Amino acid sequence: MVIIMSEAELKEAMKRNPHLRRYIENFKRTYMRIPDFMVSLSRELKELKYPNIIYPVGDPIFIHIFGTPETKTKYIVIEPTLETAEEKLKYKMILNKILELAPYEETPKSVEEFEEVLTRLFNACTKVTEAVGEEGFFQRIFRFADNKIKITPEERDKFLYILKRDLIGLGNLEPIGRDPYLEDIHVIGPKNCHVVHKIFGMLPTNITWEDEIELADYLKNLGERMGRPVSDANPIVDGTLPDGSRINIIYSTDVSPKGPSFTIRKFTDVPISVTQLISWGTFSTEVAAYLWLCLEYGMSIFICGETASGKTTTLNAILPFIKPNSKIFSCEDTPEVKPPHPVWQQLVTRERGPEESRVTLFDLLRAALRSRPNYIIVGEIRSVEAAVAFQAMQTGHPVLSTFHAANVRKMIQRLNGDPINVPLTFMDNLNVALFQLAVYQRGKVLRRVVSIEEIEGYYKEVDGVVTRAVFQWEPDKDRHVFTGRNNSYVLEEKIAKAAGYEDPRDIYNELELRARILEEMIAREIFDYYQVRDIIWAFYEKGLEGLPFPI
């Protein structure tokens, strides 16, 4: 839902943030209009051909999305900057003084302590004064009695923000790191930073570095802070930022001729709910109800698709369908899955260090078999760990994972070929494969589940694996068709039998009931991930009586 900032709120924001006021004044002089100010955005804004929107991402940072018929839509960061030579000198002197005093402080144990120490040191070497007077240059900066650097209230806020941004935060990338509406960040050299916005797509930004040397130093610092140092000898590094976002760094100009480059896949603190994905058209209520039954009854599912198709988003969205008293075991290279269950054993690989101390996905999956989980979640299956995953399925441990494949034929080819090498006769241990793609339609990039396939098994007569499509997406009508109604192998032969139905086709009534529950949540605009989870779990505990609405 779009929430527009009131005039009073806008005036207050400009009063708190003089840099915002100056930006708007300059913009108005140039374009003879002012942007629309919004507290929050909605996907409806995607219809705007030439957006002119400013929204906050936490004081003192604002984002301006602006396009005209003559210029491409841009992503403009509005933040405090050092504007004059005097400000730059003051800031440099303050930073040097802080670095001189820092060794005498105890090492902070948390970000909060780091901020406290930094603020204390900043206050120790500065003095805020309203008037600068008519003194000379150095007299304006120093009050010689206490050797403190004289600064104005606006400079205090500005310098503290820049210090915390550069020493504690993400430096140049701090503003876009805070933006909840971003999916990816792409930097190729010091002057080329683009973002993928959840509403407006790929946009160029005004974020730059002075030159390749400054960008290389920035990436070195980032790598050290992640515990994944980069160098010419180790130019390609994958890591995780403090907020959980994934980053891939390509450091050396020998490998990246346009200059050091990197890509960040933004991490969402609270996962997107299944009802939200349904409302966006990613899949239908029937698809979600089918997945609900599959997870309720311990089916193994692969969420398949190409890069940036939304596989992990869908995986996280459907996790509340797993019963609340289940033990979840997750193993990943980079932590991304977030089961909302109280008994969740989260493990990640360790790729650095001596060979004998490294821990691979293969190692973690072997450990999973000894941990007695109800569900095993693998971030992404790419190699020999697939053999252990299929072994887990064989021994009654359902497995959820993402997998790179555009359709069921390519999925089976990848699983059966090098380096994975799962025998065709083992394929029926996997019950369901969901295929999701990013599709370009009517000038927009949409994420859609394009099909769901059930794996029946290997048949010697056809010398291949037989699969059955139960859902298909019709692109011309943008709808999902339940082609497996009264013809689903998994629902009738697996789930209905496990549920004890005399007539296996009664399982479709259960599917329709769950679809109605999801439809009612959407009608009531229940999109919060944890609210959706609570309703699903209340249904598990008390049936229809546990729901906060009639069905």
Swiss-Prot record:
Gene3D superfamilies: 1.10.390.40, 3.30.450.370, P-loop containing nucleotide triphosphate hydrolases (3.40.50.300)
Entry coiled-coil feature ranges: none
SUPFAM superfamilies, per the entry: P-loop containing nucleoside triphosphate hydrolases (SSF52540)
Pfam families recorded: T2SSE
Molecular function terms from GO: ATP hydrolysis activity
Family classification: Belongs to the GSP E family.
Protein name listed in UniProt: Uncharacterized protein MJ0900
Species of the source: Methanocaldococcus jannaschii (strain ATCC 43067 / DSM 2661 / JAL-1 / JCM 10045 / NBRC 100440)
Taxon lineage: Archaea, Methanobacteriati, Methanobacteriota, Methanomada group, Methanococci
